[in-house]
A protein has these predicted regions:
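C-terminal outer-membrane/trafficking sorting elements
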Residues: 15, 622-668
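Short proline/glycine-enriched turn/loop motifs at strand-loop junctions of beta-rich domains
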Residues: 332, 394-397, 446-454, 521-527, ...
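Conserved structural position at the C-terminal beta-strand
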Residues: 489-491, 576, 660
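Short, compositionally stereotyped local motifs that mark structural "simplifiers"
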Residues: 423-509
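Surface-exposed, short loops/turns at beta-strand junctions within beta-sandwich domains
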Residues: 476-484, 563-568, 651-654
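Aromatic-rich carbohydrate-binding modules that target alpha-glucans
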Residues: 463-474, 521-565, 577-589
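Aromatic- and acidic-residue-enriched segments that line the glycan-binding/catalytic groove
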Residues: 72-80, 118-163, 225
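Active-site-proximal helices and loops of the catalytic beta/alpha 8
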Residues: 21-36, 46-55, 65-67, 72-79, ...
Length: 668
């Protein structure tokens, strides 16, 4: 009995530790992997393709709500409908699983956007029934708050003879959906099953809870304890005192976004007074900075093309985006970088993150104000092993330069500078590892107490030695091709503090793809392609397609497209137009994230009145593996085919890729 008791105690301790809200001494950096209505950039395939660039810099990626919604058009997911079906506007469930798995294999966790304050319905009161692992889960009308939608729901319920919960909403109301009563045993059962599915089945490692002002914080604590989730952050949009109260009421089982940190930054910029960074925020309190997820901009505050957030809009002016991020990344708390900022300043942000990690800064690090006035603000942040990172924002040139015996400048940009304490004893290059589209210069710096320290470096991946190429601190070297740069300190004939930088130089070249569509199952007599993304979209119902090819005994409508930019993707709807070509008779669901040649079959099943499609590219190319190279000098008599499946009369003489013996063959 005693053994069983001790086992239970140990199990409870493990659960408690894993539901601590946010780990202490955490040195990771998070990326918000989306912005408002930017569907192409947030496709699961697009995010997964960036894994190599994220690795070593980004530790967590917060992605959009991944469950399938009821709307027949692309949506951001904030009106959830299905909990266990994760085919969404951002890709298929298979693509989602692949992304999460790839991230995890590279040391990157995925944060789910969890929207449980409210739920969409068919009509006023019908929730979907979903079966998972043999158990059917479904919300009932009695799970809807009694005063939902300002009493409109109760009025409708009376008309339809439907019962609601006896409990009023615990917080703010969301008018477009039904607000859930989290005191309902059924709601708790469904939500806990959903969250366990996200963590244990899909592989999410953390939750971002949307609109937590809508229900009591205690429920977040309960859900996190039941799930054993490691990372939890709530969107409690309020002042610092109320955010702290919310964290306390979760049982300190969740972190929270540091909205005051954001407003301190925008106020400093707006009023041209950098002393406003002194103002209190979650990160500034040593007792709460563990739970502070800092950010400078997000999808609710950014400028939206549709102006749907007019009252909340508070973006960072473009000229100050690097500086705002530099301050955030240097400070304690867990920084969360906004995707548009990452896309625009990736290499610069990587160098900031490298400096943070080199100094050993975590979410619980301490700091001191170094200098300040209206024109500039500087904090010295304490890392590990006595190292410090000094961040200066505003007009850094107006500040007295720190003592060269204490600090060395390692990074500078528009409206910011980074200095690293000399006891770090390390070499440094100011261009971070990653992929670049053209050659560049990187400046090498010796950070050392020894003023006579020099630098040695190699570009072949070997550790530098005392006999390697030497450079003085501040020397810029040219990187013109892909290489591995290793640079170290040289002091009294000994090399130490080696840093490694992996540079890949790949200029993007536009390339062509072909989209093939087969409509045999739906008997369409005409086919239009409607497309959008990194391309001029046609008027609805799209471009008439007249080109066809017979491949594998089937007729395929096809059109060629050009991918014109790095990470570019196209999206499609296929439809049968009316005789006049002015509207559709019937159409497919949306197909998103296309960046390579695909074969797609339409129908016959429907989803929301639209035909479901299947990507059959692998089936059409059955037996076609990776290309092999064959010299044209070989004499082969068997048939040759183009990639589109057209048989050739003889072996091709023109260079290209062909199909031969069931393989892709490169003719040079």
């Amino acid at each position: 009995m005693k053994k069983v008791y001790l086992t239970l105690i140990a199990l409870l301790a493990v659960i408690s530790a894993s539901a601590q809200g946010w780990p202490a001494n955490y040195n990771g950096v998070m990326l918000q992997g989306f912005s408002w209505n930017a569907y192409e950039a947030a496709q699961w395939k697009a995010l997964e393709a960036q894994t190599t660039e994220f690795k070593g810099f980004i530790d967590l990626v917060w992605v959009p709500q991944s469950g399938k919604c009821a709307e027949p058009v692309q949506v951001m997911g904030y009106k959830p409908y299905y909990y266990f079906n994760h085919n969404s506007s951002f890709g298929t469930e298979d693509e989602l699983r692949s992304m999460i798995k790839t991230f995890k294999n590279n040391g990157i966790g995925t944060i789910a956007d969890v929207v449980i304050n409210h739920h969409n319905t068919e009509g006023w009161f019908t929730f979907p029934a979903e079966t998972y692992k043999g158990v059917t889960y479904q919300m009932k009308s009695t799970d809807i708050c009694k005063n939902d939608d300002g009493g409109k729901t109760a009025t409708q319920a009376q008309k339809e003879g439907v019962s609601l919960s006896n409990n009023n909403d615990e917080g703010e109301d969301f008018g477009d959906c039904r607000d859930l009563d989290h005191n309902s045993a059924n709601v708790q059962k469904v939500v806990k099953a959903y969250l366990k599915f996200l963590k244990e089945d899909l592989g999410y490692e953390g939750f971002r809870y949307d609109m937590v002002k809508g229900f009591n914080a205690s429920h977040v604590g309960d859900y996190n304890t039941a799930t054993g989730i490691q990372y939890s952050v709530g969107e409690y949009w309020d002042g610092v005192g109320n955010i702290k109260n919310w964290i306390n009421n979760t049982g300190k089982k969740s972190g929270a976004f540091d909205f005051p940190f954001h407003y301190n930054m925008t106020n400093a910029i707006r009023y041209n007074d950098w002393r406003k960074l002194y103002d209190a925020c979650l990160m500034s309190d040593p007792s709460y900075r563990q739970y502070a997820i800092t950010f400078v901009e997000n999808h609710d505050i950014q400028v939206r093309e549709d102006n749907s957030n007019e009252g909340n809009k508070d973006p960072i002016p473009t000229a100050y985006i690097p500086a705002a991020n530099a301050f955030m990344i240097a400070m304690p708390g867990t920084p969360c970088i906004f995707q548009p900022h990452w896309k625009a300043y990736e290499h610069e942000l990587k160098s900031m993150i490298e400096a943070r990690k080199l100094a050993g800064i975590t979410n619980t690090s301490s700091y001191n104000n170094y200098a300040n006035n209206k024109q500039y603000f500087a904090n010295a942040v304490n890392g590990t092993n006595g190292r410090k990172l000094l961040v200066v924002v505003g007009i850094p040139s107006m500040m007295t330069t720190p003592s060269k015996t204490e600090y060395t400048r390692i990074l500078s940009g528009k409206n910011y500078m980074y200095y690293l304490s000399n006891n770090s004893e390390t070499a440094w290059a100011d261009k971070a590892s990653g992929t670049y589209e053209e050659g560049f210069e990187t400046t090498l710096t010796a950070v050392s107490k020894n003023s006579n320290a020099k630098l040695v470096y190699t570009t072949n991946g070997n550790d530098p030695t005392a006999s390697s190429t030497q450079a003085t601190s501040g020397t810029s070297i040219n990187i013109s091709s892909s290489c591995t740069l290793k640079v170290g300190l040289l002091i009294n004939g000994t090399v130490s503090g080696i840093r490694t930088y992996n540079y890949s130089i790949k200029r993007f070249e536009p390339y062509n793809i072909t989209v093939y569509v087969n409509t045999d199952a739906v008997n369409w007599k005409k086919v239009n392609f409607y497309y959008w993304g990194n391309i001029d979209k046609p008027d609805w119902p799209g471009t008439p397609i007249t080109q066809t090819k017979m491949i594998d005994g089937k007729n395929w409508y096809y059109k060629d497209f050009t991918i014109t930019q790095k990470g570019g993707m196209l999206n499609f709807v296929f439809c049968e137009p009316n005789d006049a070509g002015t509207k559709e008779k019937s159409q497919s669901v949306d197909i998103t994230g296309i960046n390579s040649t695909v074969f797609i079959k339409v129908g016959p099943e429907k989803d929301g009145g639209k035909y479901v499609v299947t990507n059959v590219t692998k089936e059409v190319n059955t037996g076609i593996d990776q290309p092999i190279t064959e010299n044209t000098g070989k004499n082969v008599n068997n048939a040759w085919y183009t990639l589109s499946g057209m048989k050739m009369n003889q072996k091709p003489n023109q260079a290209g890729i062909y199909i031969h013996h069931g393989k892709k063959v490169v003719i040079k």
